[in-house]
Amino acid sequence: LTHILLVDNFSVEEKNRNFTDKKFTKTLDRSEFLVWFEKNPEQVSFVYHIGARTDTTEFNIDIFNDLNLNYTKSIWKLCTVNTIPLVYASSAATYGLGEFGYDDDEKNIPLLKPLNPYGDSKNDFDKWAILQNEMPPKWIGFKFFNVYGPNEFHKARMASVIFHSYNQIKEKGFVKLFRSHNPNYADGGQLRDFVYVKDLVDVLYFAYTSNLNNGIYNLGSGKARTFLDLA
């Protein structure tokens, strides 16, 4: 990919390390992007919308409605009007406790019960997207599972379990795991689907180059592992 425009909140200096020595055309603050996009659609051929407020401990619903729901709707509408393909990040957090399984069949989306406002905001957009009659010429939503890999240093407590575990082992020689609150799982026996970020990027690029059908897909390894196995 060439002529890449990076859009983010660049006031967080720690993020600068993520794109040092990377090839891109320029950066643009997220607060300016929608206006720029509306005025310059001819400069855009494809949109990856991966950014979001992902803090699962944040309970200010207005923040999620603003950044995750309404902002994404605006990008969708601009891509639709200007016939520009869109790939966006949904989340496995939409599945909640998994009462309805983890199948990415779209008929299950209205049934899902996320556990926090972050998951709600992602599911709310998914529900909205599948009801639209007007859409980008190509659109794909990927439900990211537990992504880990390089450049998580700016994410603080929201970095992956693998990132935190690695640093604990490096500093203390051991890793401290969460106690299980589900009687069906022993301590350390909780399951997560961990997916390496570079594998995820390969799939995102595949979505750019392929004729994948429009819709919402799971994006994980396809195999859950326990925290004990991870440790």
Predicted regions and their residues:
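N-terminal Rossmann/SDR dinucleotide-binding element
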Residues: 1-46
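Conserved short acidic donor-positioning loop in nucleotide-sugar-dependent glycosyltransferases
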Residues: 9-10, 92, 222
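NAD(P)H-binding glycine-rich loop region in Rossmannoid oxidoreductase-like domains
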Residues: 30, 36-67
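Catalytic helix-loop patch of NAD(P)-dependent Rossmann-fold dehydrogenases
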Residues: 66, 70-74, 81, 85, ...
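Conserved active-site region of classical short-chain dehydrogenase/reductase
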Residues: 69-73, 198-201, 205
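Glycine/proline-rich active-site loop of Rossmann-fold NAD(P)-dependent oxidoreductases
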Residues: 123, 135, 147-163, 171, ...
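Hydrophobic "lid"/C-terminal helical patch
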Residues: 129, 204-208, 231
